[in-house]
Curated annotation (Swiss-Prot):
Alphabetically ordered keywords of this record: Cell wall biogenesis/degradation, Germination, Hydrolase, Secreted, Sporulation
Biological role stated in the UniProt entry: Probable spore cortex-lytic enzyme involved in the depolymerization of cortex peptidoglycan during germination.
Location relative to the cell: Secreted
A single BP term in Gene Ontology: sporulation resulting in formation of a cellular spore
Protein's name in the database: Cell wall hydrolase CwlJ
Molecular function in Gene Ontology: hydrolase activity
Gene3D superfamilies in UniProt: Cell wall hydrolase SleB, domain 1
Taxonomic superkingdom: Bacteria
Pfam families: Hydrolase_2 (PF07486)
Family: Belongs to the CwlJ family.
Encoding gene per record: cwlJ
InterPro entries (UniProt xref): Cell_wall_hydrolase_SleB, SleB_dom1
Gene Ontology CC, one term: extracellular region
Length: 141
């Protein structure tokens, strides 16, 4: 069962975002970026109180994804990426992104905190940051 409402266009949109943000980190990295995005749709806390759809999440401004400003994001999603997006929408979670709401790619080590949120792990190039369960209980359900 899907963890967020969606249509086929949103599955492809999520797939394009996952590829544009983390293709260099492979399938697992793309799944983690997808986890972070879906967590933003599920959450109604912190930076994401009015994000209720995949489309809202992908194009959130300010605070959205840098990849949406680059041409590569607008290329059609491949079937393999669409399959990964479906897995995330169905609720598959990958550590350290299981409860994350933010990620970024630093040049060096992951900062312990990023905008007041704690680092929960790194996968290849990306550092992941999660809220506390007290601040954002929806992403811990």
């Amino acid at each position: 069962m899907a963890v967020v409402k969606h249509n086929e266009a949103e599955v492809e949109l999520l797939a394009r975002l996952m590829r544009a943000e983390a293709e260099g980190d492979g399938d697992l990295g793309m799944l983690m970026v997808g986890n972070t995005g879906i967590n933003r749709v599920i959450a109604s806390c912190l930076d994401f109180p009015n994000i209720r759809t995949i489309t809202n999440m992908v194009y959130q401004s300010p605070g959205g994804f840098e990849a949406t400003q680059k041409g590569y994001f607008y290329q059609r999603a491949r079937q393999s990426e669409i399959r990964l997006a479906r897995r995330v929408i169905q609720g598959e979670r990958q550590h350290p992104a299981s409860n994350s709401l933010w990620f970024f790619m630093p040049e060096g080590a992951c900062p312990e905190q990023w905008y007041g949120q704690w680092n929960v792990g790194r996968y290849k190039a990306h550092c992941f940051y999660a809220p506390t369960a007290a601040d954002c209980p929806e992403v811990f359900r």
